[in-house]
Design a protein with these regions (language model features):
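Phosphopantetheine-dependent thiolation modules in NRPS/PKS and related acyl-activating systems
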Residues: 1-39, 43-90
Length: 90
């Protein structure tokens, strides 16, 4: 896996899910909730906090897009990448 954002997102999600709920094969299309890592709402919140610690404040103003962003490891990585590129540097 060459995408550093996706690689870090997967590391974070694996840490939150733990080894018992980490699928044998994990990639961009792996679901964060049912059928994938089986994360509940509190664990998804942990993922959000860990991603904010790793990448900065990328979830502010997410609103109705939250369900789409938190669907798969890839959708989360894509949203983080888009929001970190859009943030002013300084």
């Amino acid at each position: 896996m060459t995408d550093p954002v996706l690689r870090r997102v997967i590391e974070i999600v694996k840490q939150v899910a733990g080894p018992q709920r980490t699928p044998a094969v994990v990639g961009p299309s792996t679901l964060l909730a049912g059928g994938g890592f089986w994360l509940d709402s509190m664990e998804l919140f942990e993922v959000i906090l860990a991603c904010e610690a790793a990448f900065g404040s990328v979830f502010r103003g997410l609103g109705e897009d939250a369900a789409r962003v938190l669907h798969t490891a890839g959708s989360l990585a894509t949203a983080i990448r888009a929001r970190t590129q859009a943030q002013p540097r300084g």
